[in-house]
Amino acid sequence: MSIKISSLKEKMKQALTSTKKVISEDFVNKNEKKINTNDKLPETLTIDDLSSPQDFIRLRAEFDSSALEKKFSDKKIFKNNLPKNLSYKTLYTLAEKTRYELLGCQMLKGIEKNLNQNYYQIMNIKKEQKLNTKEDVMVSEAFELYLLKNFQKIKLNSISEKKLSFWENDFDKSIK
């Protein structure tokens, strides 16, 4: 890898890490001796994985989401209320993620733009599948689409709408 690309990736890492610290308000006061060891990159993507604009969009969204989780989510409360059932855990985790991302989107429009771009990108990657019944769609995927549509006001594409259509009435009855 050339020195120029390596330098650019290091600057990008610094910028994203600094942005994450500011959003999450996780910076060390000069008078404090505390050293922050939680300054890690989101684990699903690293700077070295960047090879396209889509990767950069995903990385920005992951950093923003990670920062918002740190700012707005209390791990102790989250764990105390975490359901035992695996399916319920997944739905609970999705609802919590939507909650803190929604708070962040209300706080900063740049975060909203980054997250929305990433969700649109994810939806557009998914291919048309054979969807005939509710059993063809995982409840967690449908629930995430429901949360995106109804709380984050993201316009779903036709494939996502079809996936959600099998579950939407059930979610409406349970939530509204």
Question: Which stretches of residues belong to each language-model region?
Answer:
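Basic/hydrophobic alpha-helical interface regions
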Residues: 1-176
